[in-house]
Amino acid sequence: MSGSRQAGSGSAGTSPGSSAASSVTSASSSLSSSPSPPSVAASAATLVSGGVAPAAGSGGLGGPGRPVLVAAAVSGSASAGGAVSAGQSRLSCAARPSAGVGGSSSSLGSSSRKRPLLVPLCNGLLNSYEDKSNDFVCPICFDMIEEAYMTKCGHSFCYKCIHQSLEDNNRCPKCNYVVDNIDHLYPNFLVNELILKQKQRFEEKRFKLDHSVSSTNGHRWQIFQDLLGTDQDNLDLANVNLMLELLVQKKKQLEAESHAAQLQILMEFLKVARRNKREQLEQIQKELSVLEEDIKRVEEMSGLYSPVSEDSTVPQFEAPSPSHSSIIDSTEYSQPPGFSGTSQTKKQPWYNSTLASRRKRLTAHFEDLEQCYFSTRMSRISDDSRTASQLDEFQECLSKFTRYNSVRPLATLSYASDLYNGSSIVSSIEFDRDCDYFAIAGVTKKIKVYEYGTVIQDAVDIHYPENEMTCNSKISCISWSSYHKNLLASSDYEGTVILWDGFTGQRSKVYQEHEKRCWSVDFNLMDPKLLASGSDDAKVKLWSTNLDNSVASIEAKANVCCVKFSPSSRYHLAFGCADHCVHYYDLRNTKQPIMVFKGHRKAVSYAKFVSGEEIVSASTDSQLKLWNVGKPYCLRSFKGHINEKNFVGLASNGDYIACGSENNSLYLYYKGLSKTLLTFKFDTVKSVLDKDRKEDDTNEFVSAVCWRALSDGESNVLIAANSQGTIKVLELV
């Protein structure tokens, strides 16, 4: 035997030391089954893929020099011969016994002993089988193909494997096709895409398995999943016990995770609650500090720590007899100090009654007042001067809120033309420049002018107007000029704006440019010649008393329900629309508004100026909203009245806001608080046709309201009217 390496050839009658050259007859993927002549010795396949050399050493199959990978060993003179190609996808795990071999196996000795055929296994389970796809296995390295390249013959391999194989042998390892040039390799993009998808599916399965159980139990859970797909008749007791064990383990795991999650949520809740309470505690401590500071300041201002001198008290009557004085003295000293102490017993009765009524209102609206106080005082705490001004601001708010206790009627008028008239809605009430006369207009197409002093002085409720004017259509709004005492403007349902002489009843101007119903008209307080009107044609028109046509027009894009000039500027105008917004314009630039106030949920029926910087708006969403002309958000919302479909009137005297309600009542608000201050219920006056109707069944509503604003600023008188035509002159007391 020479020193050259052999792939492990041998025959049945040849000793292990004899030399026989091995050859490869074909590169097919299966063993050839064609018979060979009897004289031909059995041949053993050697590895040809990639030029892999056999293991070093000499000897046959059983010797120490056998090759690393042996495809098959066949012995016997009549056995089938063949070779195993390098493209074989799987190697048999046991040598197959050849048929027709007799008496030759003894020559191989113990080294050629046959291995038993192993039972197919799948994940360690007996009697199971898994069909693994070899579509993407490289015929050279028997692993998943990496960077698939193919030869001209169409076979695909890993690029590294086929490149190394062709460097040693220029033939295809699969079909033995001659590859002339190593560069004649082409990427197989389709196979690469399929392999990528296969890897993604495998990763998804592994991800689910890794996250469903721990790494130690992953194999057992894989067994459990396989058992679930097994027929129940094939399950034995061991399998059932395994499944129960895994389920109990999973149950305990889920219970532990659920309990941990509950504890985590509880911990988060407790921490958030603790943080909120700490913040509340800090806020309360700040508020207490402010309260203590203000209490000391008020005590110093009221002089409670200084003794009350005799000169500072109300002069007393002559002292009674000693017997009586002793009783009085003992009574006085037994009373606690404060509002009900001795110093208060010396006050006038009106003081005590006023204080009692204010206390009553303070108790009824304590929460609102408390909120108002802290919003005023906690807004910005700085120096002593700022603190004093904030306290004075709240003191003024508290004083105005508790000033009035009730609403008292002074006089009653009627706008109805006759007893059988079913509709006598008063749509507008306005005072003239000096508040000496007031005009009433409505759906009866009449404007009635009354003298305020005469109405108040008459002992009876039958009052006749000083003048009466008749229009061609229902009247929606009227407005007095702030400069000309007799000049009155009206708007009606035909879209006409008319200028009247309020005392003679003569028409001076008629404007007919609106295409639809005109809802509102208003004179400019700073420019006596300028007035504005708003209509359902989505236009606000500006008029001059000297001209016959409009001087400007603003496109509102929605029905205009109300229009009002600023009381402190000749250029600024506000109007409410059916688009739920209040639009604020500068007349020097009518192309776009200065501000659009959004917040109402329905159409804005009224917009009135509380001051030069504040606007109050009413809507059919049953809310009033207070706005600042320089801020887009709502300052305060007023709720309590009912307004869902009608024009119920809106007016303000600077501090108090009055509006009607669809429950036939008048509501009053203070601009600093959101809740209702006072209410006044109109009596239901039944006509002859409605005498059998119950009071709760009526659909009457307060339709108009107006304050009597005097030049000195005192304004506690207002006039309100309802849909029955009843007009009430009311006073706040």
UniProtKB/Swiss-Prot annotation:
<dbReference type="GO" id="GO:0061630">
    <property type="term" value="F:ubiquitin protein ligase activity"/>
</dbReference>
<comment type="similarity">
    <text>Belongs to the COP1 family.</text>
</comment>
<feature type="repeat" description="WD 3">
    <location>
        <begin position="513"/>
        <end position="553"/>
    </location>
</feature>
<keyword id="KW-0853">WD repeat</keyword>
<feature type="short sequence motif" description="Nuclear localization signal 1">
    <location>
        <begin position="111"/>
        <end position="115"/>
    </location>
</feature>
<comment type="function">
    <text>E3 ubiquitin-protein ligase that mediates ubiquitination and subsequent proteasomal degradation of target proteins. E3 ubiquitin ligases accept ubiquitin from an E2 ubiquitin-conjugating enzyme in the form of a thioester and then directly transfers the ubiquitin to targeted substrates. Involved in JUN ubiquitination and degradation. Directly involved in p53 (TP53) ubiquitination and degradation, thereby abolishing p53-dependent transcription and apoptosis. Ubiquitinates p53 independently of MDM2 or RCHY1.</text>
</comment>
<dbReference type="GO" id="GO:0016567">
    <property type="term" value="P:protein ubiquitination"/>
</dbReference>
<dbReference type="GO" id="GO:0000139">
    <property type="term" value="C:Golgi membrane"/>
</dbReference>
<feature type="short sequence motif" description="Nuclear localization signal 2">
    <location>
        <begin position="197"/>
        <end position="208"/>
    </location>
</feature>
<dbReference type="InterPro" id="IPR042755">
    <property type="entry name" value="COP1"/>
</dbReference>
<keyword id="KW-0175">Coiled coil</keyword>
<feature type="coiled-coil region">
    <location>
        <begin position="231"/>
        <end position="306"/>
    </location>
</feature>
<feature type="zinc finger region" description="RING-type">
    <location>
        <begin position="138"/>
        <end position="176"/>
    </location>
</feature>
<feature type="site" description="Interaction with TRIB1">
    <location>
        <position position="474"/>
    </location>
</feature>
<feature type="region of interest" description="Disordered">
    <location>
        <begin position="1"/>
        <end position="43"/>
    </location>
</feature>
<dbReference type="InterPro" id="IPR013083">
    <property type="entry name" value="Znf_RING/FYVE/PHD"/>
</dbReference>
<feature type="repeat" description="WD 7">
    <location>
        <begin position="695"/>
        <end position="731"/>
    </location>
</feature>
<dbReference type="InterPro" id="IPR015943">
    <property type="entry name" value="WD40/YVTN_repeat-like_dom_sf"/>
</dbReference>
<dbReference type="GO" id="GO:0043161">
    <property type="term" value="P:proteasome-mediated ubiquitin-dependent protein catabolic process"/>
</dbReference>
<feature type="repeat" description="WD 2">
    <location>
        <begin position="470"/>
        <end position="510"/>
    </location>
</feature>
<keyword id="KW-0833">Ubl conjugation pathway</keyword>
<feature type="repeat" description="WD 1">
    <location>
        <begin position="421"/>
        <end position="460"/>
    </location>
</feature>
<dbReference type="InterPro" id="IPR036322">
    <property type="entry name" value="WD40_repeat_dom_sf"/>
</dbReference>
<keyword id="KW-0539">Nucleus</keyword>
<feature type="region of interest" description="Interaction with TRIB1">
    <location>
        <begin position="645"/>
        <end position="647"/>
    </location>
</feature>
<dbReference type="Pfam" id="PF00400">
    <property type="entry name" value="WD40"/>
</dbReference>
<keyword id="KW-0808">Transferase</keyword>
<dbReference type="InterPro" id="IPR019775">
    <property type="entry name" value="WD40_repeat_CS"/>
</dbReference>
<feature type="repeat" description="WD 4">
    <location>
        <begin position="555"/>
        <end position="595"/>
    </location>
</feature>
<feature type="short sequence motif" description="Nuclear export signal">
    <location>
        <begin position="237"/>
        <end position="247"/>
    </location>
</feature>
<feature type="region of interest" description="Disordered">
    <location>
        <begin position="307"/>
        <end position="327"/>
    </location>
</feature>
<dbReference type="Pfam" id="PF13923">
    <property type="entry name" value="zf-C3HC4_2"/>
</dbReference>
<keyword id="KW-0863">Zinc-finger</keyword>
<keyword id="KW-0677">Repeat</keyword>
<dbReference type="GO" id="GO:0032436">
    <property type="term" value="P:positive regulation of proteasomal ubiquitin-dependent protein catabolic process"/>
</dbReference>
<dbReference type="InterPro" id="IPR001841">
    <property type="entry name" value="Znf_RING"/>
</dbReference>
<feature type="repeat" description="WD 6">
    <location>
        <begin position="640"/>
        <end position="679"/>
    </location>
</feature>
<dbReference type="InterPro" id="IPR017907">
    <property type="entry name" value="Znf_RING_CS"/>
</dbReference>
<feature type="site" description="Interaction with TRIB1">
    <location>
        <position position="493"/>
    </location>
</feature>
<dbReference type="GO" id="GO:0010212">
    <property type="term" value="P:response to ionizing radiation"/>
</dbReference>
<keyword id="KW-0862">Zinc</keyword>
<keyword id="KW-0479">Metal-binding</keyword>
